[in-house]
Regions:
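Juxtamembrane intracellular "pre-TM" segments in multi-pass secondary transporters
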Residues: 1-14
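Short amphipathic helix-loop junctions that connect adjacent transmembrane helices
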Residues: 29-44
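Interfacial helix-cap and linker-helix signal at transmembrane-aqueous boundaries
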Residues: 35-36, 67-68, 159-165
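Helix-to-loop junctions at the C-terminal end of transmembrane segments
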Residues: 60-73, 161
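C-terminal ends and interior cores of transmembrane alpha-helices
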Residues: 83-97
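Intracellular juxtamembrane helix-capping segments at the cytosolic ends
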Residues: 117-130
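A late C-terminal transmembrane helix in Major Facilitator Superfamily
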Residues: 129-163
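A membrane-interface helix-boundary motif in multi-pass transporters
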Residues: 159-177
Length: 195
């Protein structure tokens, strides 16, 4: 209990939950619906766009060790927050401005970059919260948070879709990204600086 309900563990779990909310809500659940409704996109086209997100994640993941030596983890998390905000904002405005689905690869790529920063950094930080013998407890809790986010985020962002259509999940995504930024700014452990 002292490990699970430790303040840093709760904060990091909250960040993990919110980051996965953006992934499983606006991106994985509602982007295919948007692509179908606005662009009549085929499943293969939607899959190709998602591949771009994977490329963004991979590009950052391959350079994360170098970035971690050059910049503090807190700064990287704030940069990821900016990426989330930019990606969600572009998803909100681009469909009204462009006629091709392929323009949406830009925000999807930027979102992939954000994922490539946040998920490894949060996982790495979580593993430092407990001695080796108790690390499985922390990681199991982290996995539970992930699954909870996976289950609840489509329902949560669906409220926005229900009230204002396809723009709803992305407007809510901007709000969630700003909450992530506020949590990182005020509470991300200073001890993670240039680890």
């Amino acid at each position: 209990h002292s490990i699970i309900f430790h303040s840093p563990a709760i904060g990091l779990s909250g960040l993990t939950f919110l980051c996965f909310c953006i992934l499983y809500g606006p991106t994985i659940t509602y982007f295919p619906l948007l692509a179908d409704i606005l662009y009549k996109a085929t499943p293969s086209h939607i899959g190709a766009v998602f591949t771009v997100a994977s490329l963004g994640t991979a590009a950052i993941a391959m350079n994360l060790a170098w970035l971690g030596r050059k910049y503090s983890h807190r700064r990287l998390m704030l940069s990821a927050t900016c990426c989330y905000v930019v990606a969600q904002t572009l998803m909100l405005v681009l469909p009204d401005a462009v006629s091709s689905l392929w323009w949406l690869t830009l925000p999807i790529f930027i979102g992939g970059v954000a994922q490539g920063l946040t998920f490894p950094l949060l996982n790495a930080r979580m593993t430092t919260l407990a001695p080796t013998r108790n690390r499985a407890i922390v990681m199991a809790m982290n996995g539970t948070v992930l699954r909870l986010s996976q289950s609840l985020s489509p329902l949560f962002f669906g409220i926005g879709w229900s009230y204002i259509g396809w723009r709803g999940p992305y407007a809510m995504g901007i709000g969630v990204a700003l909450v992530i930024g506020a949590l990182v700014w005020r509470g991300y452990p200073v001890s993670s600086e240039k680890e």
